[in-house]
């Protein structure tokens, strides 16, 4: 999925599927973002693929909610894919995502997220749990040298 803030597209977020499908400038921008995201996700050229799916998000009308417009990928879904709702809800409980930035700060423990779509609402329970953290430190070079390996190693 490629989450995009409605405001970054000059949208309110509550546009109807018909309004979005008629907005060729927004559709072209979403497609450009989708193609770039496909490359950055390691999916290669996604021109002829349905993945990744673009999703427009904006603040919900109540606490713990997010407004979502899900694309398949070149037209707005009339309601919302369930798998897409799970992705939007997951993004809204993870720190630092576009959905979180829309005012849905992550909370400890299980949290219900209401994904508001053109045909209604989907309630998804989500929880952020850090399973692992890793890093590679590249601050400075600590070794440079040459290793000489004998042509034949002694038998043991």
Tell me the role of every PLM-derived stretch.
Residues 1-156:
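Active-site proximal loop and beta-alpha junction motif in alpha/beta enzyme cores
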């Amino acid at each position: 999925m490629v989450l995009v803030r409605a405001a970054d597209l000059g949208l309110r977020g509550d546009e109807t599927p018909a309004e979005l499908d008629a907005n060729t400038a927004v559709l072209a921008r979403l497609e450009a973002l989708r193609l770039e995201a496909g490359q950055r996700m390691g999916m290669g050229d996604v021109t002829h693929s349905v993945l990744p799916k673009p999703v427009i998000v904006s603040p919900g009308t109540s606490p713990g909610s997010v407004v979502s417009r899900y694309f398949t990928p070149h037209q707005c879904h009339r309601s919302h894919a369930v798998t897409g709702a799970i992705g939007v809800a997951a993004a809204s409980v993870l720190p630092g995502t576009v959905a979180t930035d829309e005012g849905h700060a992550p909370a400890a423990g299980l949290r219900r997220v209401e994904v508001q779509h053109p045909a209604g609402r989907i309630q998804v329970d989500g929880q952020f749990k850090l399973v692992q953290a890793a890093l590679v430190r590249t601050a400075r070079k600590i070794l440079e040298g040459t290793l000489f390996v004998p042509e034949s190693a002694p038998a043991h």
